[in-house]
């Protein structure tokens, strides 16, 4: 049995292995039998893990800060754009609706009129999209600045931030009364329709001047082109009859100059005014018609003041002051029988006016008288 075992070749170590005579016991060929041991890793990590990218905490922090900043900027841009679009759209809608209610001239009816009226109170806070015309800008009040006069409360212009100097032309806006340099505010109003300081809209309300038609005056027929109509507007019709009746009674019982002076003083205590307007054509509506009526208007006391002293002097010299008043009253008493429909108050008013025509009438109510130039007698005086 022992002889059948293979005999091993004795190992003879040689240091020169290049000749190929090395045996299997040579350390160079040991890897054919056993695999080589793994290499020793000092860091404790495998070769696969060490081959991947390594991120430091500083890089991660920088990336996080940049991402947060980007998100905040994007959010701010989106919100500002969205909110600005909504606010401008809302302003246009509210501005158009309130402007239509203010300048529509009553196009809506019923509840829609009340809704437009409520919107008109808020319309001055909404900025219109366009500016004003040059004609409207020129209608705004222009004044000269004087330091210390109290007319302009501010001392500088809010547009150019420059101070006002004496003699400069300033514009006062109609609603808020803020003052600005004329050139500065004109440039601003060409692209804006509101005040640059308080944002109040600059609105112009056109008020039509209607021709003053006296109350209580019955419409009469026109006699042609030569019709001359005189309208007397009197104030104080309520207390006029009693005072005029008292004055006439004083005049009828006065026998000397002292009584005549008392009558004159009693009539002047009325403290009234009457206005007379002469109209040669039907009144036209507008500012020109208003100026025409104002030019043709005069006070009865101013017209008859000059003849007052002459009439009193003539009455005292002739001694017919009391008799004249009584005769006037009797004549009107006889004529009153044929005046169907006239009131007692109108007769007393006419008697008092004819007795002392130079006196002023008290203030209070309103009445009117109209007469035609082609009539010989006084026309009826509707009350």
UniProtKB/Swiss-Prot annotation:
The keyword Transcription regulation does not apply. Its main location: membrane. Its EC number is 2.3.2.27. InterPro entries: ATL1/ATL16-like, Znf_RING, Znf_RING/FYVE/PHD. Pathway: Protein modification; protein ubiquitination. It catalyses: S-ubiquitinyl-[E2 ubiquitin-conjugating enzyme]-L-cysteine + [acceptor protein]-L-lysine = [E2 ubiquitin-conjugating enzyme]-L-cysteine + N(6)-ubiquitinyl-[acceptor protein]-L-lysine. GO terms for biological process: protein ubiquitination. PROSITE patterns: ZF_RING_2. GO terms for cellular component: membrane. A zinc finger (RING-type) spans 157-199. GO terms for molecular function: ubiquitin-protein transferase activity; zinc ion binding. Residues 105-129, 269-291, 320-383 are annotated as: Disordered. Keywords: Membrane, Metal-binding, Transferase, Transmembrane, Transmembrane helix, Ubl conjugation pathway, Zinc, Zinc-finger. It is found in: Membrane. It is an enzyme of class 2 (transferase). Possesses E3 ubiquitin-protein ligase in vitro. PANTHER family: RING-H2 FINGER PROTEIN ATL16, RING-TYPE E3 UBIQUITIN TRANSFERASE. This is E3 ubiquitin-protein ligase Os04g0590900. It comes from Oryza sativa subsp. japonica (Rice).
